[in-house]
A protein has these predicted regions:
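Positively charged n-region of N-terminal signal peptides that target proteins for export
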Residues: 1-4
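C-terminal motif of bacterial Sec signal peptides marking the signal peptidase cleavage site
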Residues: 15-19
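Protease-labile, long low-complexity intrinsically disordered regions enriched in Pro/Ser/Thr
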Residues: 23-207
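Hydrophobic helical h-region of N-terminal Sec-dependent signal peptides
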Residues: 6-14
Length: 207
């Protein structure tokens, strides 16, 4: 079947008065990008990251890349040790800049409902969305408002991802945020979900 290879790199930017939520000066700190792999049948998969920055934490250990045995239910197994994982994790620091010219201004108290709807439209399953929300909600809901903007190249250009064999569907959702004391006007974005077909890889994270 002809591969769809849908690349949807989506950066959710929640921005406050001085920069991304987890940043220092011009340095952004991508937090918890995690990668799920769902092949059609059990197979060995190698994942490498071309990151424009410095990796500060990876699990399992990154080394020169990560090779796992992936199963259709998302279970990943280290072929050398037999240890099982449900995702691959990394964090790092980068000077990448994100585009806030379009997005959404969302009240902190409305964050959970907004993310449930947005992540569904962006193609995440309920389980994937739940894990995203559980991690990011405590950082966002206490702010009066958050500016949220979904991007493509702003994230993928600084964090190139190579998966071998290549997935038929690739979804990358990335969240960088900054809290606001008052609402702002921003050009709204149109969110669309890719069709999840055949071997699917899903990544989410933020900064």
């Amino acid at each position: 079947m002809k591969k769809l290879l849908l690349l949807l790199a989506l950066t959710l930017l929640a921005a406050g008065l001085a920069g991304c939520g987890n940043s220092s000066g011009n340095v952004a700190v991508p937090e918890k990008p995690v990668l799920y792999l769902y092949p059609e049948e059990e197979m060995e998969v190698t994942v490498t990251l071309d990151f424009d920055g410095t990796l500060t934490s990876t699990y399992p250990a990154y080394g020169d890349g990560r090779t796992v045995t992936a199963r259709p239910d998302g279970t990943l197994t280290n072929p050398a040790t037999g240890r099982e994982y449900y995702c691959l994790f990394w964090e790092g620091i980068t000077e990448a800049e994100y585009d806030f010219s379009a997005g959404f201004c969302v009240a902190g108290e409305d964050t959970a409902a907004f993310l449930e709807d947005a992540l569904d439209r962006l193609g995440l399953t309920e389980r994937e969305a739940d894990e995203f929300i559980i991690y990011w909600l405590p950082k966002l809901e206490g702010n009066p408002y958050n500016l949220l903007s979904f991007q493509t190249e702003a994230y993928t250009d600084s964090a190139g991802l190579t998966i071998d064999p290549a997935p038929d569907t690739l979804i990358r959702v990335f969240l960088a945020w900054k809290g606001l004391d008052a609402p702002v006007e921003v050009e709204p974005q149109t969110l669309t979900a890719p069709e999840r077909a055949d071997f699917t890889a899903v990544e989410w994270g933020g900064a």
